[in-house]
Amino acid sequence: MNYKQNEKINQVKESTLVVGIDIGSTKQYARAFDWRGIELGKVFTFSNSREGFEAFKAWMQHLQDKYKKSDVIVGIEPTGHYWFDLGAYLEDEGILLVMVNPYAVKQTKELDDNSQSKNDRKDPKVIAKLVTEGRYSAQYTPDGVYADLRIMVANRKRLIREMTQIKNRFARWFAIYFPEYTDVFGDYEAQSSMLLLKKVCTPEAIVELGAEKINQIWRDAKLRAVGMKRATTLCETAKRSIGLKKGSSAARYEMKLLLEDYEYKKAQLDAVMEEIEKLCRKIPESEQMLAIKGIGVITVAGFLAEVGDVRRFESPRQIQKLAGLSLRENSSGKHKGQTTISKRGRSNLRAVLFNAAIPLIATNPEFKSLHEYYTTRANNPLKKKQSVIAISCKLIRVFYAILANGVTYDPQKLLSDIHRQPQAA
């Protein structure tokens, strides 16, 4: 599939049947047009099932035979996950599926009737119109290790979100029943703290158990970081606690549930991380990516999950656009506004790169030097956040070179931006 717009337009010929689909959770609505935008047939509704997909294919074949169309392009506005099964079916059947940008659909739908209304008949026509104008992108569904990585990275993200919810529930519990607990244990997730919370958690229960027995719990578990001093401090703090005493029995049960949820989700997260590491090892070039100081498995896995096989891209600039890191100028007439990033692309990929750039600047000598150069150079110095974006784009080029060309990471080549400036002067 070609990516230049003129080439996309040329792929829609007089012999092409253009079909736009409005994707839904249970039903899809399709409309067919020729290359000039003239509608062929009526709206076709089909269910999100094999029978529905086969009926849709038969409907398209009927229109192809009736209007003498030799090929077909199906355009959709990707809506959540509802298009995945249809996309896989069309791919298996050898039918070309392309994507139109939801933002473009929103902006274009008012042209026909000067109304921002949305309905199942209107959207397929707008989608098909965008396809005939070449305003679409080719469908890409990762397969093999890249598909597995995308799923596992999404699972990790979900588990982290659920762990955050559990930690917020812990914070609420302590704020109500034992606000002073975190003064004694700076980190309630410490092994000594979690072990104690399984035995006792409310201030009155801690006082009743006593410092000796608390210390014995830690000694039996062979924990050396805590001892009698910490146990005594905890008991004294519990005696003076302002925590709520009403409902203490239910509070203890709530803590039991919290601990069970925490351990279960933590075990799941550890297992997912283990799988992610295994998947990364299946991609030989990932070792070179991990050899860069400051780059970890999370960054490598996140990048590969979002981008897939980089060899499908002609240049790293296309990945930069995919991440929504392309520069956007805000100018009109004599006014020249600030240049910003487009933010039109995969937000997860953008987050992976941005979150990787910050520790790189802090720990990697080459990237740190590059950041200092960007922010202090005499000609067009960047603000710190702008420099982080520039570092993110530089990281894309480094990863692309490693994955597409199989080269090793060269710190001196990375610093060429700095070395080039004196030569130009």
Residue ranges of each PLM-predicted region?
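A detector of single, family-specific signature residues
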Residues: 1-425
